[in-house]
A protein has these predicted regions:
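Divalent metal-binding pocket/active-site signature
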Residues: 1-42, 52, 60, 81-85, ...
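Solvent-exposed polar/charged
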Residues: 18, 63-64, 100
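Residue-level signal for inorganic ion chemistry
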Residues: 27, 75, 109
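Short amphipathic alpha-helices and their capping/turn segments at secondary-structure boundaries
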Residues: 57-67
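Short acidic/histidine-rich active-site segments
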Residues: 68-85
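Mid-to-C-terminal alpha-helical segments outside catalytic/metal-binding sites
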Residues: 92-124
Length: 124
């Protein structure tokens, strides 16, 4: 399992992982939608966090990730610009957003994300 922060290098990273025989998680992905779609085709997962909900680009990216490729992460304590200390409650806001996006109950979304984590751990 590779967890990659591809900031300012999404296209290069997607090109490099093409043909990789393992599981790739793109952490806090911020690249183009074109490269996002290519990464999805390559089987990548995407870890999203509370800060991504705070920007138009972050929300646009989340809206383009299939629910079966979503993972949650905090990036704490390294996330900057927070007005308050990062707590586990921030995950609830992410689940609420995803629930609204996919028009699914929060419990269904939580089970889906948990299943995604389990699948990642079972893959090569």
């Amino acid at each position: 399992i590779l967890s990659i922060h591809s900031r300012s290098a999404a296209k290069k990273v997607v090109n490099m992982i093409n043909g990789f025989d393992g599981t790739v998680i793109l952490h806090w992905y911020s690249g183009s939608i074109t490269d996002l779609r290519r990464a999805i085709e390559l089987g990548c997962y995407f870890s999203i966090n509370h800060q991504m909900l705070q920007s138009t680009n972050g929300r646009n990216i989340i809206e383009n990730i299939p629910v079966d490729r979503l993972l949650l992460e905090s990036d704490a304590p390294f996330t900057k610009g927070l007005k308050e200390k990062y707590t586990i409650d921030f995950n609830d806001e992410i689940y609420e957003y995803i629930s609204g996006l996919y028009q699914q109950e929060i419990d269904v979304v939580k089970k889906r994300v948990k299943a995604n984590f389990a699948k990642v751990l079972k893959e090569k």
